[in-house]
Regions:
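Acidic, two-metal ion nucleic-acid-processing modules in DNA metabolism proteins
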Residues: 1-131
Length: 131
């Protein structure tokens, strides 16, 4: 039984390139990693983890997407979106607004109306207290 659980965890493991704080999720960081493009199977796009964050101002959007701000313990925040997950455990964790979450995703350009920004595109969410 324990061996099966370990194998299942290993199959679901995500590769993470760096653990960062929301304050580090900047356009400058995104642009520095964009120099490594083009991305594909042999050169995956960098994945980042945020630890101990809270999903603030979560909104369920059309299509089951969840938009929020991920806020770290120091109050620094990054805009974030999780695609088609509102009905899944990851989406429910974001929509609950609970803190202490670990989030994995990728930085993406968020350019609108002449403003160049960045958003965190969420791939997975976990609550370490539930492991």
């Amino acid at each position: 039984m324990a061996g099966e659980r370990i194998q299942a965890i290993a199959l679901d493991a995500l590769e993470i390139d760096a653990l960062i704080d929301p304050a580090a999720a900047t356009r400058a960081l995104l642009e520095s990693f964009e120099r490594l493009a083009p991305f594909g199977p042999a050169n995956p796009e960098p994945a980042f983890a945020l630890s101990g964050v809270q999903a603030r101002e979560p909104v369920a959007m059309n299509g089951g997407h969840v938009r929020c701000r991920l806020v770290g313990p120091d109050g620094a925040a990054v805009r974030a979106i999780a695609w088609r997950c509102a009905d899944l455990p990851a989406g429910q964790a974001l929509l609950s607004g609970q803190g202490g979450l670990s989030v994995v995703g990728r930085l993406k350009a968020d350019d609108w109306n002449g403003r160049k920004g960045v958003q965190f595109e969420i791939e997975d969410v976990s609550d370490p207290r539930m492991v």
